[in-house]
Design a protein with these regions (language model features):
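Single conserved hydrophobic/aromatic residue that forms the stacking wall/gate
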Residues: 207-216
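Short, glycine-rich, amphipathic interfacial segments at transmembrane boundaries or analogous
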Residues: 202-206
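P-loop/Walker-type NTP enzyme "switch/lid" segment
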Residues: 11-17, 32-108, 114
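Walker A (P-loop) phosphate-binding motif
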Residues: 2-32
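Short, well-ordered alpha-helices that flank and scaffold nucleotide-derived cofactor binding pockets
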Residues: 24, 28-32, 55, 125, ...
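Ser/Thr-centric signal marking residues that sit
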Residues: 20-22, 171, 213-214
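Short aromatic-enriched loop/helix-cap "lid" or pocket-rim segments at secondary-structure transitions
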Residues: 50-54, 179-182, 210
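Conserved catalytic-core segment of NTP-binding enzymes
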Residues: 39, 112-199
């Protein structure tokens, strides 16, 4: 296939680490804030979480005049319509990407976590970057490291593959946990040759957002 844009995948074989949420956040940031032409390919069969979220949002907009007004204001401010979200079976990821790459600056892929799924490893080595969210949980950590190790072993067989880097990043950071814990994990990652982003994402479920009816 002829790749004419940047391919970025978020992938981890452990569920609940925020993979789909981060895909949406990154796509929205680059599309609406940075002005890039972005598309998302939801490959996480069978749940297709991002496509389900988009369908729910569209129904909410259809039922709400205030949301319609907000959408119009956003378009007036940014000149950007909603970015496309397509679903794809694991074996047709690159075929779907080929249809979108000519009109996009960045394609984001929400990949399934099972690397044994046919076509997934081939898709991963054709990415430019793979971001793997990790959380401070022993079982999740073991699963994440096993996942990355499998990818690295496979990539070594294809030295000419487009994939540049696999990068880990901390998600759902619990502010109550000592930073020494995260520093210790980062040292382990570094010793085994894994790169970790310095930017971390907090656990928003621990942040109480004040509401007009809620006392401080």
């Amino acid at each position: 296939m002829s790749k004419r844009c940047t391919f970025i995948a978020l992938s981890n074989q452990k569920g609940g680490v925020g993979k789909s949420t981060m895909t949406v956040l990154l796509a929205s940031y680059f599309h609406y804030v940075k002005g890039k032409n972005v598309a998302v390919i939801d490959c996480d069969y069978p749940q297709f979480s991002i496509q389900a979220l988009r369908s729910r949002d569209m129904k909410n907009v259809e039922r709400s005049e205030s949301l319609q007004q907000l959408l119009c204001r956003q378009y007036e401010r940014t000149g950007k319509k909603a970015y496309p979200v397509l679903t794809s079976g694991p074996g047709k990821v690159l075929e779907t990407a080929d249809r979108l790459s000519g009109n996009s600056d960045i394609l984001f892929f929400d990949l399934p976590g099972t690397v044994n799924t046919p076509g997934i490893l081939e898709a991963i080595i054709n990415m430019d970057y793979v971001f793997t969210p990790v959380v401070q949980d022993r079982m999740v950590m073991q699963s994440s490291l096993s996942f990355v190790a499998t990818l690295r072993d496979f990539i070594r067989q294809y030295p000419e593959a487009p994939l540049k880097e696999i990068l880990l990043f901390w998600n759902k950071i619990d502010g109550r946990v000592s930073r020494e814990v995260y520093r210790h994990y980062n040292e382990i990652f570094e010793k085994i040759g894994l790169k970790t982003l310095s930017t971390v994402m907090p656990d928003l479920s621990l942040i109480h957002i004040s509401e007009p009816t809620r006392p401080y």
